[in-house]
Amino acid sequence: MSKIAAAFKKQRKCFIPFITAGDPNLDVTEQLIVAMANAGADIVELGIPFSDPVAEGEVIQAANIRALSAGTTTDKIFAMLKNVRTKTDVPLVFLTYINPIFTYGTEKFLANCQSVGLDGIIVPDVPFEEKAPLAELCRKYGVDLIPLVAPTSDERIKMIAKDAEGYVYIVSSLGVTGVRSDITTDIAAMTEKIRQATDVPAAVGFGIATPEQAEEMAAVSDGAIVGSAVVKIVGKYGTDCVQPVSDYVKEMAEAVHKVQ
């Protein structure tokens, strides 16, 4: 059983925070991963900074710029993760675009994921129809290729879910990432369609910021993913962000974990 599958089995409802690697610097990223795991995060998503992150709103775009300005590279992220793995075995997932993977060398990238104990990757700009070569290499190196499912036709939702590994990332609303005041998509109906097609868990992301929203989303799926709200705290506190992020993650994880 993969570590991601084990996390959902153990917790039933998972809380999954996202941060951009290298924002404000990689030392702080390392501390954040460990602190978030200790605060109750079941899985941690890490963004690889990229100059053109098409699915991201302004909060995460700004984090990408800060991380790149701090000299963050993919090699330095892998080196940092080696250290992380001496401190925590929390499942780790990269959220990245195909360009940084392709530029790095797809096979080399996935071999390095395997060697640092990275558990999954999410690549928003690779459509389902074009994922076969990447999926094959992911399987070769034991890395789950986690699909994004947006509010779309029943057939498409089921087609993507049927092939899913790790978890299905349900995009709660169309558009870019960011905090929403309310989420209007019928998540329960989407989860139901996904469950008809696969046993792989489904977690909801895009726009969750409060414990109430996280609890609400966990009630109709298998977990809540929170990115922009965490990255906002990192942006506000800079190198002093570890404690405030940890406090926020603890509150959010408690809200998700109390859902039965």
Task: Locate the predicted segments by residue.
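Glycine-rich phosphate-binding active-site loops on the catalytic face of alpha/beta enzymes
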Residues: 41-52, 118-122, 127-130, 172-178, ...
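Alpha/beta catalytic cores of nucleotide-metabolism and tRNA/nucleoside-modifying enzymes
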Residues: 77, 192-200, 209-260
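Active-site beta->alpha loop and helix N-cap motifs at the rims of alpha/beta catalytic domains
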Residues: 48, 59-123, 256
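N-terminal amphipathic alpha-helix/helix-capping segment at the start of soluble metabolic enzymes
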Residues: 1-18, 82-86, 260
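Hydrophobic faces of well-ordered beta-strands that scaffold small-molecule active sites
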Residues: 15-19, 44-46, 92-96, 121-123, ...
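Active-site-adjacent beta->alpha loops and helix N-cap segments on the catalytic face
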Residues: 1-7, 52-60, 72-82, 102-108, ...
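Glycine-rich beta-to-alpha transition loops that act as phosphate-gripper elements at the mouths
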Residues: 20-25, 95-103, 127-128, 148-152, ...
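Catalytic cores of alpha/beta
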Residues: 26-36, 152-162, 204, 208-224
